Design a protein with these regions (language model features):
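Small/aliphatic-rich secondary-structure junction motif
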Residues: 1-64, 150, 164-235
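Structural beta-alpha unit
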Residues: 4, 42, 49-52, 69-128, ...
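A short helix->loop->beta-strand "cap" motif at the edges of active sites that frequently abuts
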Residues: 31, 87, 153
């Protein structure tokens, strides 16, 4: 059961669709949304600036000062976006569970070893909602990959457009692997609420056979999920020789 959703907030314009996606997911399971702003100080954000190590000293100083100001601006934006979100959607702010089965929210900010702290929060959550990285938000270039591979938790990537319904149709890309099994298990609460579930697989070396695919579909039936299955053939690369 998904009851806690981590929502990293950048303080930039990407927050809008990330927050909307998190709210839509939260409403499907009355979850608590923990909004986390990772405040990257200049020393941490500087590596995101291309070739900064080759810049002359005075230029680097000005760049670091600019990064500091941008960081403060994003921090203020993250706080503001959170407060506006809770006010507009009437989401109760609280740090501990209440009696009512409703969406609640909390906010925190980390600046000391930000990526380490972000991963720690991610591992202690049931689900993470992330936005696509933009250069202006100071987030690491491989944030999504890092959280996916090192948190051990499922992630949802918010779309660029405002989502209307996050659980209408869910496509499951399946491969016979430990990672796929773990991801499917973590996603079961969402699959159980979806109106349509599609199992997608490709026949290749190490991929599921038809019998394995059918067995997976039967397993989902035990959870009340009547999934459609699409098992295709991977086209051969390259032309005839």
């Amino acid at each position: 059961m998904i009851k806690t959703i981590l929502v990293p907030t950048s303080g930039s314009g990407t927050d809008r669709t990330v927050f909307a996606t998190a709210l839509a997911l939260g409403r499907t399971c009355s979850a608590h949304l923990h909004f986390l702003h990772v405040h990257f100080v200049p020393a941490t954000a500087a590596p995101q600036v291309p070739q900064i190590e080759f810049w002359p000293g005075p230029v680097v100083y000005d760049a670091l000062d600019s990064l500091r100001q941008q960081g403060e601006h994003l921090s203020a934006g993250a706080h503001r976006h959170f407060e506006e979100f809770c006010q507009v959607h009437r989401v109760e702010i609280r740090d501990s569970p209440g009696m009512a089965e409703v969406v609640t929210a909390s906010f925190s900010e980390e600046s000391d070893q930000p990526m380490t702290r972000l991963l720690s929060h991610a591992r202690h959550s049931d689900l993470i909602v992330l936005g696509r990285r933009r250069n202006r938000d100071h987030l690491p270039a491989r944030l999504i990959d890092t959280v996916l591979m090192e948190s051990g938790r499922p992630i949802v990537i918010a779309p660029d457009a405002m989502p209307r319904d996050v659980a209408s149709t869910i496509v499951v890309g399946w491969k016979e692997s430990k990672e796929a099994a773990q991801a499917l298990g973590a996603a079961l609460p969402l699959l159980e609420k979806a109106r349509r579930v599609v199992l997608l697989g490709v026949v290749e070396q190490g991929a599921p056979s038809r019998s394995a695919f059918d067995d997976l579909a039967r397993q989902l039936v035990w959870h009340g999920i009547d999934a459609e299955d699409v098992l295709g053939q991977r086209p051969r690369s390259g032309g005839a020789r």
